[in-house]
């Protein structure tokens, strides 16, 4: 995300709401999922430009209360040509106990990789993505204020590890589209697995989870 001065941050470590993102009262922020479309390669060393827009805002009523869904679109251009289009789904929810199980068991078959999400890994990912959300590194805040059992693994980090596992298992694949959806949080340092399987020519299903079941589902389209 864009760098923001300390004075421009909210209590949770994110940029204060009401600027680019809409105000959302005192609700907690969660990353619900996203989609990435790879249209053409970005040239290393070349100048690129990102254009960000709010594509969709929707209020829903869930089992835990009111939910505000926001979809942000990022277009990455080089030489005035669109190279990558990313959509991020963000949800703001009322403070409620986080889910500990999705009710969906882990999937068998295909490739699998074990992951141990250390606090250092979470901190480094927060740093490289300029993500100040305190649920990823501030133990007192995440456990006492937001009610999680420990540090929360970033949804995009899980997606990144899932995509890396896919590329390792399919080194000749050329990515076209990637989509993922969060089902529940993963808590560090509890180990989890990422994995997947080819379900059709040019298409794979990916997943991530632990002994409590699935935490994220994803799909890849490739050549």
Task: Name what the model sees in each region.
Residues 1, 33, 39, 45, ...:
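Surface-exposed loop/turn and secondary-structure junction residues enriched for glycine/proline
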Residues 1, 78-79, 90-153, 167:
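Catalytic strand-loop segment that frames the active site of acyl-thioester-processing enzymes
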Residues 1-47:
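Hydrophobic, proline/glycine-rich low-complexity stretches
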Residues 6, 17-18, 26-28, 33-35, ...:
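Generic secondary-structure boundary/loop-capping signal
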Residues 13-19, 39-42, 51, 116-117, ...:
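Generic detector of short, locally flexible boundary/turn motifs and exposed helical patches
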Residues 17-24, 100-104, 164-168:
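Intrinsically disordered, low-complexity boundary segments flanking structured domains
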Residues 31-117, 186-189, 193-223:
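HotDog/MaoC-like acyl-thioester-processing domains
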Residues 142-201, 205-219:
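Catalytic-pocket segment enriched in acidic/His residues
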């Amino acid at each position: 995300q864009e760098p923001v001065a300390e004075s421009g941050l909210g209590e949770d470590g994110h940029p204060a709401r009401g600027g680019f993102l809409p105000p959302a009262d005192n609700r907690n922020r969660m990353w619900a999922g996203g989609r990435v479309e790879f249209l053409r390669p970005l040239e290393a060393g070349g100048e690129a430009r990102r254009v960000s827009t709010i594509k969709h805002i929707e209020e829903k009523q869930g089992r835990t209360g009111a939910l505000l869904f926001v979809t942000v679109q990022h277009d990455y251009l080089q030489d005035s040509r669109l190279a990558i289009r990313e959509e991020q789904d963000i949800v703001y929810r009322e403070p409620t106990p986080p889910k500990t199980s999705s009710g969906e068991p882990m999937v068998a078959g295909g490739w699998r990789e074990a992951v141990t999400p250390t606090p250092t890994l979470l901190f480094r990912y927060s740093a490289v993505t300029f993500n100040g959300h305190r649920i990823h590194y501030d133990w007192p805040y995440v456990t006492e204020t937001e009610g999680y059992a420990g540090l929360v693994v970033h949804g995009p980090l899980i997606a990144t590890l899932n995509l890396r596992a896919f590329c390792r298992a399919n080194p000749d694949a050329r990515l076209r589209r990637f989509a993922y959806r969060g089902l529940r949080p993963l808590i560090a340092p509890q180990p989890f697995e990422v994995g997947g399987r080819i379900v059709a020519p040019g298409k794979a299903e990916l997943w991530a989870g632990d002994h409590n079941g699935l935490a994220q589902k994803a799909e890849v389209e490739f050549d």
